[in-house]
Amino acid sequence: GIVHEDEIDNKNILQATYLAMRQAIGKLSIKPDIVLIDGNKADIKHYKQKNIINGDQKSLSIAAASIIAKVTRDQMMRQYDIIFPEFGFAKHKGYGTKQHFEEIKNQKASPIHRKSFNPIQNHLPTFAYIKRNHLINRLGKQLLACHLIRIGHEILELDDDNSQVKEIDIISRYKGELIFTNVDTIIVEYRRKNIESLTDVLEENRILDFIDNYIADQALDGKFQLYMSKIYLGKGNPKIKIFNKSIVNNSIKKLEENY
């Protein structure tokens, strides 16, 4: 099971851990006879438990699960490193190293940092800070990329000052298909009219030309999709809409709002 930073902030780390355990058990195709818990008794009902303090040192099953958990987490942090390269997640994997804390002080916390964690609370960016430093569009791309990770995408590229991606903001892979995502970040209180309008035809053609050249340059083959996305920033949590467009013979064949 995977529990993200917002759920940890809402529930606390212990309850979030229990939730991840329940998610993992719920995905099993066979009901286990017993659940081995590394530590004290967990809030898991309907299953017999065996609690083992320092279980990763005493149980091969728990040790193997710990390795899988660490490898999975490290892979996620490498994905987040593409989205937030300034924090060096690929190097320290999000742990509380000196370098990590220095970057938080210098850059302000990112959306994936736990807001309830005391060192983070002193370095949360305000909307005024984001606007003053011209980070609104970048934040929109980052939030959309984080959303794609949560629903199972592998992030390949994200458009920032150092990326070669131009017309497309995010390139990802999902269920074997290459996904090109265009992100439109909207501040709700400043654009109340026509906020539902889609990207115009000229821009779509320019985007398709970019995708066609990218596919040719990379000598890619297979299925491709274009996500035209909108992320609305305002009071409360961001609102995300993604319009899924299949690409066939360099033309848009289908439009479907899928998130």
What is the predicted function of each stretch?
Residues 52, 173, 231-233:
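A generic structural motif
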